[in-house]
């Protein structure tokens, strides 16, 4: 009998299965300053295929230079207290047979000074500072 519809063909027509090529590249570089006091190191790598693309980069900066900067000191807080002002009355003398009371004077209370240190929320005062030989960053 005839088995043409059920058997595999003897020849296969068409292109062979080929994986498309991938393109890759990588680079590294180190730039050093005079006397090797500071350096910038870079590394990058890329892989590209017809279906995807991936890149990675790493950049590192080091600075071992000695740099002297004056220390900044905050000014001392100033607190001011107003003087306590009072008014004293004299007591009149009672008749000889009477009882003389001393005038009552309330204790003088001075107004307190201002708080010596002002506190803020942490995110409002958080900052970063970097100082190098030729660069300074702060925020």
From Swiss-Prot:
Keyword Repeat: yes
Highest taxon of source: Eukaryota
UniProt keyword terms in alphabetical order: Cuticle, Repeat
Sequence repeats: 7-10, 68-71, 75-78, 93-95, 105-108, 121-124
The keyword Nucleus belongs to this UniProt entry's keyword annotation: no
Pfam families in alphabetical order: Cuticle_3 (PF11018)
Molecular functions per Gene Ontology: structural constituent of cuticle
Record function comment: Component of the cuticle of migratory locust which contains more than 100 different structural proteins.
PANTHER family named among the record's database cross-references: LARVAL/PUPAL CUTICLE PROTEIN H1C-LIKE PROTEIN-RELATED (PTHR39068), PUPAL CUTICLE PROTEIN C1B-LIKE PROTEIN (PTHR39068:SF5)
Annotated domain remarks: The tetrapeptide (A-A-P-[AV]) repeats found throughout the protein are also present in many proteins constituting the protective envelope of other species.
Name this protein carries in UniProt: Cuticle protein 76
């Amino acid at each position: 009998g005839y088995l043409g519809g059920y058997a595999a063909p003897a020849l296969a027509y068409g292109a062979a299965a080929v994986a498309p090529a991938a393109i890759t590249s990588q680079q590294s570089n180190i730039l050093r300053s005079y006397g090797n006091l500071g350096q910038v190191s870079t590394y990058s790598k890329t892989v590209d295929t017809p279906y995807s693309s991936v890149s990675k980069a790493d950049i590192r900066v080091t600075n071992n230079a000695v740099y002297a900067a004056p220390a900044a000191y905050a000014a001392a807080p100033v607190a001011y207290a107003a003087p306590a002002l009072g008014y004293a009355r004299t007591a009149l003398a009672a008749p000889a047979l009477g009882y003389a009371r001393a005038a009552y004077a309330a204790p003088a209370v001075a107004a307190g000074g201002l708080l010596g240190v002002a506190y803020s929320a942490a995110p409002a005062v958080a900052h970063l500072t970097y100082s190098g030989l030729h660069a300074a960053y702060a925020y």
